Each structure stands twice: as C-alpha cells, then as structure tokens.
Amino acid sequence: MRSAASTDRGETESDPLFGGVSGAYLGSMLVPPVIPLIERVGVTEAGTLYLALIGTVGLVTTVTGWVLSSRPPVAVTLGATRARWLPSAIAFAYAVIGFASLETTGVVGVLAFFLGLLAFLLGGAIAVMAQTRYTAAVTAGTEEVTRWRASWPESARRRRLYVGGAVVGVAAVGVAVGAVFDLALLQYTGQVLFPSGFVLLPTGGTRTAVATERGLEIRLPVARWFYAWNELESYDLDSESLVITRRWGSDLRFATADIDDVSLVEWTLAERLSDD
C-alpha cells in the first residue's frame, strides 16, 4: 500500500487520452462475449456481424472515453495503488482462457485470445498513464531538494542485455519448433514472449530522479513514477552505482559516474534513508 499523499492539484482539466485508451481496453474485452448475443438475435451474415462488432467497440470506446475524460481524479486514484495493474492481469487471464477454449468456442475463442493480448497491452498503458498522473498530482507544488540524471550502471545493463537476448532467442526457437511440428501452444507462447524480450534489450536509457520532501520521483521520456520515502528502505553508493532499495519491488539503480553532484545526492538520501 502507498502512504496517503496529498493530491491537491487542479483536477478540472479533461483527460481524453486516458479515457480513450480505457475505452479501447473495455471495448476489446467486450467483443468476444457480444458475438453470441448478436448471433442469438439472428445476425449471422459475416459482413453484418462484422459491422455490428465494429459498432459495439466504437460505442463502448466512445462512451467510456467520454465518461473518464471528464473525471481526471479516477486516473489519479488508480495510479496511487497497485490496482493499476489489475486491468493487464485480467486481460492476460482472458487471453489464456480464450486460448484454452479454442476447440469448443471457435472464432469466439480466437478473438478472446488475440483481443485479450491487445487488452493486456492497453492495460499496461492504462497503468503507466495512471501512475504518471498520480505522480504529477502528488508532486505538484512540492519543494525540490535535489535532482540527478543518470543511466543504468554497467553491470545492470549487461544483465538486462543477457536476459532480454535469452528471452528473444528462446521465443524465436519456440515459434520455429512450433511451426515445424504444428504445436500451436508453443507458437503462440513464442509470439507473446518475443516482443517481451525486446522490452528488456534497451540498456542505455537515462532517467531523471527528483528528490522532494514527499519522496523520490523518477522521470522517463513517457512516464513518471513516485516513491514516498517510507516506500524506500536504504541506499548503497560506490564508485560504480547508486542503488536505492525499495521495500517492495525492484531496486532503483543509477550509474555513479553520471551523477553531477554525488555529495548532495548522498546527503539527501542519508537524511531520509539508512546507509547499507
């Protein structure tokens, strides 16, 4: 659980991006169960069925987007908790169920699998956007103590490169073997893992860390993350890396050589965290 933090920010602005992505997520999830309902009322011709599905997705996306766009606090509230990852988890389970039911559900199962994977990606985008909006709200008006900009330490870069390369390699082999021996499960698994490996391959990303009285903010090109000081346990600083240990989740790692004022950063952390 995150500690309570004030988010007394102007929240009257509309947020069409968050609303639109959320609407697309919900629309993708609703398509498979809608098919039997449409067929039950007598719509069986492929073209008509396709138009009905497009209309359903469009309607759900539009309505959901309109409702959430005018309610920015929804994104802020979601971003304050780990429940922001729930949409992705639900969509992944949805895709798995769709795949497992292919033999009995036919086209509905196929759509559930592929649209579930699409919704999984959209759910991840929802989580990142919600976290970014929460971070913007909780850090608005706070006094900045210090900031630094640094990339990953060399050892962490190598680990990410090795793990990402291994995932890509295993996924490629899985797709090839699945195609040769007609193993659908192996093929689909490889197709899902292949792009996941590429997520780990980039190792040169530089992040900006901003220390405030409320906590530590991490700024990426497309996202912002906030950690209250009570969510961070300790820090360790040496000539290669600065490692900030979180109570839950992966550690925050920075290359020491990239930090302009190491002494100020160390003082800031020492005032608030224990030194390993």
Regions found by a protein language model. Give the residues of each.
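Short, flexible active-site loop motifs that bind/organize anionic cofactors or intermediates
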Residues: 206, 222, 255
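Short beta-strand element of the conserved SAM-dependent methyltransferase core
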Residues: 131-133, 211, 244
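Eukaryotic intrinsically disordered, low-complexity regulatory linkers and tails enriched in Ser/Thr/Pro
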Residues: 1-206
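Phosphoinositide-dependent membrane-docking surfaces
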Residues: 211, 216-218, 224-242
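Acidic, Ser/Thr- and proline-rich intrinsically disordered linker/docking segments
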Residues: 140, 230, 234-276
